[in-house]
Amino acid sequence: MRFTNIVTSFIKNGDRILILKRSDKVKSMKCLWAGVSGIIEKNDTSPLARAKTEILEETGINEEKIELLKANKQIKIEATQYKNHEWNIFPFLFKTENPEIKLNWENSEFQWIKPNEIKNYETVPE
């Protein structure tokens, strides 16, 4: 089975978390809501380093404006859109205070939601 290593970060601001709507220009999971995500590259020093890079690229929030709250265990999920493929997801939770969000081309919208509101959004697979 093939696999892809991915980071997914959720950013907390008070009692809300940031979710992003993936644009129709990305390769997979188009127009679905998710945390800040990206593929871990071969030259990345760690999943945490990649998570911080993705946060900057996708939201404009730099490393000085975020604080790591939790790094969870790796999660393995079968990729439904590819045969014999697995996503290895490295999840992170960060906090920030009232950041200005500047989306890049990978996402078309963002929302600050209470965690229990996630059920109201069409999200990437769990």
Locate each region found by the language model:
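Conserved N-terminal beta-strand and adjoining loop/helix that marks the start
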Residues: 1-18
